[in-house]
């Protein structure tokens, strides 16, 4: 009887605690990419040149190194910026809205998991993505980085491919000379995670995170 009870405890302990939202943090980009079999799309907010014409601050597509669509946004240090990422299953269109700008894209692959990646490469800079709500349910975790630093929040447990709405708030902060390009940025990276992490990752995909 004791052996049976122990066996049942082990089996039940291996089952998911909840069928709802599950979060975890991963330490590196290589680890994150090992969980993504195919990237469906990435919604990114980055410091850019803070609304100037030299580059962009918002982008959407399957490759941040060559995004499908971009927009300008005049980031201000310490100012909270609400955003929304929505996927409509019937039309196969994802939209990314921040600061009154809406970007649209049609993903080519299915997906079931997303990562919230925040990165600050320079001292005296920080970024935080918080207040995440998925389909009306609080995610209950945040992603934040203080320079030089990286934080990656993985979110699973919801059938995203049937359609979803994710809302949250991003705050980019700096003192002194502001950073540029992707030195202060967040990404909502959505993809199809294999049941077993891949043994190899694409160096090209990793490089796209650091342009």
Where are the regions a protein language model picked out?
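Sec/Tat signal peptide C-region and signal peptidase I cleavage site
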Residues: 15-19
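Bacterial N-terminal signal peptides
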Residues: 5-14
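A short, hydrophobic C-terminal helix/tail in secreted or cell-surface proteins
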Residues: 198-210
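Short, basic/polar N-terminal leader/transit segment immediately after the initiator methionine
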Residues: 3-6, 22
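Mature extracellular "passenger" or substrate-interacting domains of secreted, surface-exposed proteins
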Residues: 20-194
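Positively charged n-region of N-terminal signal peptides that target proteins for export
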Residues: 1-4, 211
